[in-house]
């Protein structure tokens, strides 16, 4: 029992250290013209997740306080499983205000103190996206529930000044902290690398 408690404490400390590093690296951005406002994001999330949730609104507010207004967002679903090493696969639609909508797929490996599986509906806020095609790359970060309120978890992933903030709500059980990345592609693939 003590070893389980020590493992959980270590996971929480590692996750907290990773979150602090991500927050320190990303200074709050000024509001971007043409970005999606909090009301638009909460409404889209309400329609997608099925219920209006105070937890969803709080997670979106936290993301906006850290990174400003996103110029795109993805609505989709994903599945993941892990036992030390893990995999995540998902698909959805990237919505932008002035560049149209785009079907995207994502996949990625993880490694860390992690075990379990989950299926999740996912909303990803996308910041500093210069064009829709710029989403097709790897976004690295520390995965796990960096910020967790009312059944919604938020993490942050970055690549080439673009920030992707997945907000997940799902079923299943996955406990731990891990390091990994998400790779976005224009077509579904089983290869997470």
Which role fits each region the language model picked out?
Residues 19-25:
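Sec/Tat signal peptide C-region and signal peptidase I cleavage site
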Residues 8-18:
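Bacterial N-terminal signal peptides
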Residues 25-193:
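Small-residue-enriched, tightly packed secondary-structure blocks
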Residues 1-9:
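Bacterial N-terminal signal peptides that target proteins for export
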Residues 5, 13, 152-153:
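A detector of low-complexity, intrinsically disordered, Ser/Thr/Gly/Pro/Ala-rich segments
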């Amino acid at each position: 029992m003590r070893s389980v408690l020590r493992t959980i404490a270590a996971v929480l400390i590692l996750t907290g250290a990773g979150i602090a590093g991500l927050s320190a690296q990303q200074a709050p951005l000024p509001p971007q013209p043409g970005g999606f406002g909090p009301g638009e994001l909460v409404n889209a999330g309400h329609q997608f997740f099925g219920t209006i949730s105070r937890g969803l609104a709080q997670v979106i507010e936290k993301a906006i306080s850290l990174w400003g207004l996103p110029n795109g967002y993805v609505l989709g679903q994903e599945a993941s499983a892990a036992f030390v090493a893990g995999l995540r696969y998902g698909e959805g639609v990237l919505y932008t205000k002035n560049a149209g909508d785009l079907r995207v797929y994502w996949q990625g490996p993880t490694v860390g103190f992690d075990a379990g599986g989950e299926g999740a509906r996912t909303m990803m806020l996308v910041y500093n996206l210069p064009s829709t095609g710029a989403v097709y790359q790897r976004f690295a970060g520390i995965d796990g529930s960096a910020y967790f309120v009312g059944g919604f978890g938020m993490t942050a992933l970055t690549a080439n000044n673009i920030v992707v903030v997945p907000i997940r709500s799902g079923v299943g059980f996955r406990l731990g902290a891990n390091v990994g990345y998400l790779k976005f592609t224009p077509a579904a693939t089983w290869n997470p690398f």
